[in-house]
Amino acid sequence: MIIKMRAVTVHEVPEKVTAATERKFLRDLQQYVETERPRLVLDCSKVRQMDNNTIHLLLCCLEEAMKRNGDVKLGAVRPDAKATLQFAGVSRLFEVYNTVAEATQSFRQRFGGIAPPLLEPVEQEREAENVA
């Protein structure tokens, strides 16, 4: 069985999110989420304060990815920012990692304790032939 790994895109969240920086960020990100099942890691290392604008930006990214059956994970999130995400009630929507590398690697872990992905019909036929 051949399993192709889709690319993981890492995008750096700006230090301060304003209406203008949010529009630019989402415009830049659009080319990466317009794929089937986009896999995004948002690098939060520059985020000093997890305010409402930043949380809104994260949620917009998640919404765009989920429209295409993708996922967004957060990397390099500071402890105070994690606390703010929990307080705002959105921490359960994201997998949060201490580093960008850990967040990226989490996409590469096979099955990660969940049900394996469905096999393509051709692969299912091959599996059935091997059993018979």
List the model feature ranges, each with a label:
Residues V8, P79-D80, L118:
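Short, charged low-complexity linear motifs
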Residues S106-R110:
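Receiver (REC) domain switch/output surface
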Residues G113-A132:
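CheY-like receiver
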Residues V17-F94:
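Amphipathic alpha-helical interaction surfaces in cytosolic regulatory modules
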Residues M1-V13, V17, K24, V131:
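Short beta-strand/loop segment at the start of cytosolic alpha/beta domains
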